[in-house]
Amino acid sequence: MSCVHYKFSSKLNYDTVTFDGLHISLCDLKKQIMGREKLKAADSDLQITNAQTKEEYTDDNALIPKNSSVIVRRIPIGGVKSTSKTYVISRTEPVMGTTKAIDDASASISLAQLTKTANLAEANASEEDKIKAMMSQSGHEYDPINYMKKTLVGPPPPSYTCFRCGKPGHYIKNCPTNGDKNFESGPRIKKSTGIPRSFMMEVKDPNMKGAMLTNTGKYAIPTIDAEAYAIGKKEKPPFLPEEPSSSSEEDDPIPDELLCLICKDIMTDAVVIPCCGNSYCDECIRTALLESDEHTCPTCHQNDVSPDALIANKFLRQAVNNFKNETGYTKRLRKQLPPPPPPVPPPRPLMQRNLQPLMRSPISRQQDPLMIPVTSSSAHSAPSISSLTSNPSALAPSVSGNPSSAPAPVPDITATVSISVHSEKSDGPFRDSDNKLLPAAALTSEHSKGASSIAITALMEEKGYQVPVLGTPSLLGQSLLHGQLIPTTGPVRINAARPGGGRPGWEHSNKLGYLVSPPQQIRRGERSCYRSINRGRHHSERSQRTQGPSLPATPVFVPVPPPPLYPPPPHTLPLPPGVPPPQFSPQFPPGQPPPAGYSVPPPGFPPAPANISTPWVSSGVQTAHSNTIPTTQAPPLSREEFYREQRRLKEEEKKKSKLDEFTNDFAKELMEYKKIQKERRRSFSRSKSPYSGSSYSRSSYTYSKSRSGSTRSRSYSRSFSRSHSRSYSRSPPYPRRGRGKSRNYRSRSRSHGYHRSRSRSPPYRRYHSRSRSPQAFRGQSPTKRNVPQGETEREYFNRYREVPPPYDIKAYYGRSVDFRDPFEKERYREWERKYREWYEKYYKGYAVGAQPRPSANREDFSPERLLPLNIRNSPFTRGRREDYAAGQSHRNRNLGGNYPEKLSTRDSHNAKDNPKSKEKESENVPGDGKGNKHKKHRKRRKGEESESFLNPELLETSRKCRESSGIDETKTDTLFVLPSRDDATPVRDEPMDAESITFKSVSDKDKREKDKPKVKSDKTKRKSDGSATAKKDNVLKPSKGPQEKVDGDREKSPRSEPPLKKAKEEATKIDSVKPSSSSQKDEKVTGTPRKAHSKSAKEHQEAKPAKDEKVKKDCSKDIKSEKPASKDEKAKKPEKNKLLDSKGEKRKRKTEEKSVDKDFESSSMKISKVEGTEIVKPSPKRKMEGDVEKLERTPEKDKIASSTTPAKKIKLNRETGKKIGNAENASTTKEPSEKLESTSSKIKQEKVKGKAKRKVAGSEGSSSTLVDYTSTSSTGGSPVRKSEEKTDTKRTVIKTMEEYNNDNTAPAEDVIIMIQVPQSKWDKDDFESEEEDVKTTQPIQSVGKPSSIIKNVTTKPSATAKYTEKESEQPEKLQKLPKEASHELMQHELRSSKGSASSEKGRAKDREHSGSEKDNPDKRKSGAQPDKESTVDRLSEQGHFKTLSQSSKETRTSEKHESVRGSSNKDFTPGRDKKVDYDSRDYSSSKRRDERGELARRKDSPPRGKESLSGQKSKLREERDLPKKGAESKKSNSSPPRDKKPHDHKAPYETKRPCEETKPVDKNSGKEREKHAAEARNGKESSGGKLPCIPNPPDPPMEKELAAGQVEKSAVKPKPQLSHSSRLSSDLTRETDEAAFEPDYNESDSESNVSVKEEEAVASISKDLKEKTTEKAKESLTVATASQPGADRSQSQSSPSVSPSRSHSPSGSQTRSHSSSASSAGSQDSKKKKKKKEKKKHKKHKKHKKHKKHAGADGDVEKSQKHKHKKKKAKKNKDKEKEKDDQKVRSVTV
């Protein structure tokens, strides 16, 4: 389109008219313009002039070329000569009105005449003319012609005098002097008309300025004018260039911190440059950067500083706005005033360079603008540098460049030393630049005085400008750098990223108090800002302002603050006010570098401290905290001194500039904000208090917080990344410390938490985020938690969660805390007291020896804490976690290591971590991290879960809502973001909550605390952790399978073992598991929450959604409860427990060994100690088991919570894996739970106490872990595929039970939390053997994996079923593999490869059939809930077994191959590794059990001839299922009377006792599972070891019976196995580990309960089987042969057995898949066993109830589980029938 640009002469801008063509006519242009401008053609005409040529267009037809610019004027119609004021229309005289009417009515009057006609109506003219005339007349008076005054025409009035010559007689225009250039008229004298004389002042000189002539003839001027003239009024035209005025600038000088270093004027749009942290005008710095060739920073001269990296300095901008508002200052050309800061920049750059890397923010923190006087800044910078240089020795390592800054901060940081240094440095530097340093000096004194809070306040107030600078980067940087800079420097993590670390909590508080908001801002977006701010100005200017920067200079980074917090309450006391002394290692004088023990790495590099190798900063921090900080504590100001200092500083601040006032106001606002936050924190603190109150809780809770702290330490720089780092930095050191220390660390974190500023986010947030408090805290601030707890809040909360008694927010952010205020003082003292008590209570105990040690225990908590933080907040955390996944970081960071690994595995390690994750996760599965954390969690969860489990539905609902809103946000943020956090710090966000782990831990905790759904979420997390690996990759899923195997073993052992033993064992297991993998975490969640699961499961049965997840939890709980119940039930069961424990421990150990092999050694320092013994001493299995049991005892409570959380995890995994799976699991869990409950109700009286709980526990534990797979599988996808699909979305977080329990946050949907259940010695031995087996069976697993994949691909309807089958196969295989591993490792390798292929083919076939059936139901009810899922699995397994039996016939053939491939591949996957690990464990214990079971089964398995073909398939399947079966047979063999007898004998009498079988199945669910697992294992062994035996068909009846028995076991065990088998791929091992395959989250509640029972049975059987392992090992081959036929028959009878099995639980699905084999065992047997299983379940439920009662929620959970079990039972019965039909079809098919 062509266009012409026009503008009215009165307008500034051109408008455009568009037209077609090259030209537009003038007429058209006028029309368009009038149309656009809404002008009326009658109103005026338009005069168009060419804007360039000034040519006026007059011809309407003139063509104006396109793209011309024209100027438009409105002119009257008819036009006006542009230069003339006379109208074009000639008129004699203006016709006013009708004065001169034209009376001659000629026939046609001219228009000119007509316009003068008065009576137009009678005029002789056309109407148009009349109208025109009328218009003209009406507007004539307004005609420009009439504008001229007539008086100028003709002789003027006699009184008129010419204005030019002053003579009368002519107008000025006619003045004769007009042409006289030499004429000068005298001054014109005005008359004072209208001005009252009273306002006038007579003057004599008429020439006086403003003189006027009065009516009296005298001259006068207005009085006010005279006064103004006397003063010399400067009236300037508005737009004249201003003369540089000295008045307002001088009167109200701009604070230097508000001055741009470049333009020397007040900053506009202040931005922080990341390199040195200085602030400039946005335009100035951008111009400077762009004008420099290499984008060189004008201050620090760093090259390649991208203008895009500039961070808006919101605080400084606010300060500038406030300054402008207060002073009315308008930006003037102030560039003339080059401030002295230029010198500062050089030193500052120096500092900045040194500090820049280390303390970037501090030094650079804009020495100039931030420094009150730029000169001061420079001077200060220099002195700071010098003094800092003195400090540099101390700071140099970390913050060489921060010396100058450090000195100032030093005073802040080190109270005493700080003061001297501060006064000396601050005053020196500030006073050096005295002009502007006055504020700086005040600041300095402020710093020296109240290096803590007042320092910040003073600094901020004194350097109000700094508030702006600190505001975002500078303020925060200051505070962060002061308190946090150290960590910042320490980890370089974000210079201030580790606010908690660098600025001790308090300095953070003080500086952050002032900077609280900034920290948050910084956390969010200003980390770099902080770095830059802190770097740039922080050290010099900011240091002055905020002594903290100096501290950051000290490498004593963050960790120091925490120590002061807890290690030295006195020190912390002075410190909290904002004193950052702890920032230096307080022990170290500001000038001294922290001692090696402190191991403060250069700020940029947190070293693995001597004490704590993993947390880069952690150990140093911890050491420093415990040791150095105490030393420095003395130097830090005493409270009185501190208050005095602060008072003095405040007074000085009051003297400061308005900017300071503004800053103070700003700080006050911040303080208010912090107060709110602090109160929240207190709230959290209170809730935390319970943890503090409870030693365990504290240990675990503190651990969690410690995790927060450790994580914080770890993420020091990340810490800046708002939440994780907080938590994270705190946690790593602590976690490294060990449990006690970990708690200490946490405590320390709490100490940190004094202001808990450490997290940048308000301390309260830390509490909030990290709140480890039980529901007390949670209940207290669930909403708070919810509300603020977005990601940041949670992160913050996590961050603060572990904070020791939190001081006031003011204290936290020092700035706002005015300790002069008696209230503040008192509050601070109170805080000190509390802190001291807290410290004495928690930290002191741990500080000495425990802190470093707790890595094993603490690691559980810490890693989780660390992980989220690490992953989320800090690349270090993330990277380190990954790097130290099992290594140094894994000790304390076992979780962390795991976490990063998991998260990393999830994200970065998705591909490589599939295998790596397998091993690592399996290694990590035994990781201690989880156990420890879960211990904490257990403790906390005991309270929490009591509350949590009380209202599972409500909690779950609210948690789900909350989680979906906040926790899922957080979860997604924390857990889900964990992956991203892994890759990128949030923020978590914000805030990380150290949310990755912190998120997980917190998420778990939050989930549990917030809701049972939270527990569910945690469970889901566990599941997710367990299945996170699987979801990460199916490879990871299998990896998770092994982890879950480990979990299963752990859970098994915990299940069987006494709750305390379980707790211990699970804690140990979890410890190993957590670092090892999400599976471990899940395991932990599963393991720890066994009790929790039982409680939860029972409650969850009431709340089906919650139920589902909680059923899983309950299964864990029940497993736990079942352990004692099982023991009570049978002595054999305790033996089984031992066996299972040892098996679990072995598996754990294997997993642990893997973990240790990878990075678990570090991570499993604790595990290494505990599990290391286990690993090293398989013989001391029981000893380790005892430890593990001890651990598990603690975790038991946590297990409840843990279990509960895994439900959610499972749900999340399911959601992620398959939303169908979610619904399916929920519904399946619900329905199967209900079914089981009803079935169990019948059986419950028999075995509910022992077996119901066990079943629940086993089911729960497995369920929680396996839920992932069930979710995946139930969801209708191969776990592998799902894992692969979810690999990116899901992250497997391995948490120790304690970590899991302590984790308040709801796991992100994408996060699978695997709870590491501490492995018993036996479990570890099993694990070791499993590890060998894994090595052996990994190929088989690899083969199995394709099966699952193929299954998924080949049988879409039975894809899930296949997957389930595969999962079942995998667990069976794994169980079998573990057994064989020790005895037939090589044979199994070779034969298992062959037999696995054949067996797995058969088994895969059956499983795939069951899987297909299961999956079809799963797919159908995929949308259903987990219980539905399992119910659907069962029902659809039954129905689908019918359908699938046909499709299974087809699919089975394909699935045989697929199963062989998938199963082998699956087994080859990490799941397989886990399976193998489990198998290894199972081999030793399970083999014995299996051999026993197989001997019994031999009786039952005459029809192995039938198994010949099916046997090979069954073998493969059993190779998977046998781990489960092995576990089952372990259980049933361990408790042969119950399980074996019912199962083994039932197998023979399977047909006779179909109905009976239901009860026995329930009863023997675990036993049968074990049997089934044992049989499967034996079958697997047969397939592996006795491949030839597989063809050896005993009798199809025997095989059927065996299969039925196995199926029944599988059914009993598979009940949970349904979802379990879904999860199986990943959780195969875990199911296998748990032999009871508790984790059928599809039937998570009932199945989980069954699983728990079964798992407990498996645990008991495990013990018995372990004892019998030798016998079984011998019999293993024979039994394996029988088992294989049994498996084959299981497959054939998979349908029949699946009916029962399915009715029972995922056992159907496992029996087909596992569930298939198990189901094959015989529908009657299945029914009998189901009954037994349900009896077991009920017993387990009873035991679970007892357990839950012990835990506080036992009754409710039991009720829930009973209800669920009933429903599940009902569904099971339905499923049984369906499965029977399906089994029959399958048998026909087979």
Curated annotation (Swiss-Prot):
Gene Ontology cellular-component annotations: centrosome; chromosome; cytoplasm; nuclear speck; nucleolus; protein-containing complex
Compositional bias (Basic and acidic residues): 903-923, 956-972, 980-991, 1002-1018, 1042-1072, 1096-1161, 1182-1200, 1231-1249, 1281-1291, 1363-1392, 1400-1440, 1449-1460, 1469-1507, 1515-1580, 1663-1675, 1751-1760, 1774-1790
Database matches in Gene3D superfamilies: Phosphatidylinositol 3-kinase Catalytic Subunit, Chain A, domain 1, Zinc finger, CCHC-type, Zinc/RING finger domain, C3HC4 (zinc finger)
Location(s), subcellular: Nucleus, Nucleolus; Chromosome; Cytoplasm, Cytoskeleton, Microtubule organizing center, Centrosome
UniProt keyword annotations, A-Z: Acetylation, Chromosome, Cytoplasm, Cytoskeleton, DNA damage, DNA replication, Isopeptide bond, Metal-binding, Nucleus, Phosphoprotein, Transferase, Ubl conjugation, Ubl conjugation pathway, Zinc, Zinc-finger
Positions of the DWNN domain: 4-76
EC number: 2.3.2.27
Pathway where this protein functions: Protein modification; protein ubiquitination
Entry-annotated residues carrying Phosphothreonine: T985, T1272, T1469
Region (Disordered): 329-353, 374-408, 533-599, 622-641, 648-667, 675-797, 850-1292, 1322-1790
Biased composition (Basic residues): 736-771, 932-941, 1727-1750, 1761-1773
Bilayer-crossing regions: none
Biological process, per Gene Ontology: DNA damage response; DNA replication; embryonic organ development; in utero embryonic development; mRNA processing; multicellular organism growth; protein ubiquitination; regulation of DNA replication
Modified residues (N6-acetyllysine): K130
Catalysis: reaction(s): S-ubiquitinyl-[E2 ubiquitin-conjugating enzyme]-L-cysteine + [acceptor protein]-L-lysine = [E2 ubiquitin-conjugating enzyme]-L-cysteine + N(6)-ubiquitinyl-[acceptor protein]-L-lysine
Cross-link (Glycyl lysine isopeptide (Lys-Gly) (interchain with G-Cter in SUMO2)): K1107, K1169
Residue ranges with Polar residues bias: 622-635, 1260-1277, 1336-1358, 1618-1627
Zinc fingers classed as RING-type: ranges: 260-301
Outcome of gene disruption: Early embryonic lethality before 7.5 dpc, accompanied by accumulation of p53 and widespread apoptosis.
Oligomeric and partner information: Interacts with MDM2 and YBX1. Also interacts with p53/TP53 and RB1. Interacts with NEK6. Interacts with ZBTB38.
Domain notes for this protein: Contains a N-terminus DWNN domain, a zinc-finger domain and a C4C4 zinc-binding RING finger domain. The ring finger may indeed be a U-box domain.
Protein name: E3 ubiquitin-protein ligase RBBP6
Organism of provenance: Mus musculus (Mouse)
